[in-house]
């Protein structure tokens, strides 16, 4: 009996040695940046990543790439949004993010490397005691952000003039599969859309591939769009 148990014990011990320690929480910087730049937040010692959104024809509609320091600060961030014809490329320089091409100061930072102000748009951000961005405001609008106990973004509410747009996300009850979620969008308390996402995960509990279904309920009949998200992630 002892001889039969030995290989099993060795296998368990070896597996334990190789097991990656999973970090279930999201840093304030990762969660807050994901809100502002519209990408899925990641966990653990991320070194660099690229998230690519593709439509049903396999055409790239959006791509977000970032590099991070070992402390979790974004050293660079690049956003390519083909649907809205938008390109943003930022590089960290002391207390600012500069435009990667013109080197113009674009975003002022607070604390270690958290968002503070976007001077050109008159936008300023406020953080809570844990360093998460909870408010953004300008002369034209006010936004409030919500997070769960692990720092996962649960949605936001935007108020501008006489309009209130609210997005509420409900993640999976499995803490490993946080990016499996559903979300509902309300405009002035009227439902105008819903989202459902399901993913496959790596050993750090980060998504490597997802299916994203977006339903526009603001039109009749409702329009459903299906997207695929591909992630490449390197770790420290």
From Swiss-Prot:
GO cellular component, one term: plasma membrane
Top-level taxonomic group: Bacteria
Lipidated sites in chain (S-diacylglycerol cysteine): 17
Membrane topology term: Lipid-anchor
A Pfam family reported for this protein in Swiss-Prot or TrEMBL: UPF0257
Transmembrane among keywords: no
Signal peptide range: 1-16
Primary site of residence: membrane
InterPro entries in the cross-refs: UPF0257 (IPR010646)
Lipid attachment residues per UniProt (N-palmitoyl cysteine): 17
Keyword Acetylation: no
Record key words, sorted: Cell membrane, Lipoprotein, Membrane, Palmitate, Signal
Compartment(s) where it occurs, according to its Swiss-Prot or TrEMBL record: Cell membrane
Annotated family: Belongs to the UPF0257 family.
HAMAP family, per database record: UPF0257 (MF_01065)
Name of the featured protein: UPF0257 lipoprotein YnfC
């Amino acid at each position: 009996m002892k001889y039969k148990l030995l290989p099993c014990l060795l296998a368990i011990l070896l597996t334990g040695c190789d097991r990656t320690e999973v970090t279930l929480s999201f840093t304030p910087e990762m969660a807050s940046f994901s809100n502002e730049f519209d990408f899925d937040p990641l966990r653990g010692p991320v070194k660099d990543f690229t998230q690519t959104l593709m439509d049903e024809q396999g055409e790239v509609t959006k791509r977000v790439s970032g590099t991070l320091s070992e402390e979790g600060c974004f050293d660079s961030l690049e956003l390519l949004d083909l649907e809205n014809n938008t390109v943003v490329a930022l590089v960290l320089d002391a207390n600012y993010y500069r435009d990667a091409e013109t080197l113009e100061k674009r975003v002022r930072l607070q604390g270690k490397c958290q968002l503070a102000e976007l001077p050109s748009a008159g936008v300023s951000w406020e953080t809570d005691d844990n360093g998460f961005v909870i408010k953004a405001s300008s002369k034209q609008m006010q936004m409030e952000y919500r997070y769960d106990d692990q720092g996962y973004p649960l949605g936001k509410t935007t108020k501008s003039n006489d309009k209130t747009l609210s997005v509420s996300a409900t993640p999976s009850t499995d803490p490993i599969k946080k990016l499996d979620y559903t979300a509902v969008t309300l405009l002035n308390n009227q439902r105008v859309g819903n989202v459902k996402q399901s993913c496959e995960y790596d050993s750090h509990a980060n998504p490597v591939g997802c299916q994203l279904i977006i339903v526009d309920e603001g039109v009749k009949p409702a329009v459903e769009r299906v997207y695929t998200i591909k992630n490449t992630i390197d770790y420290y």
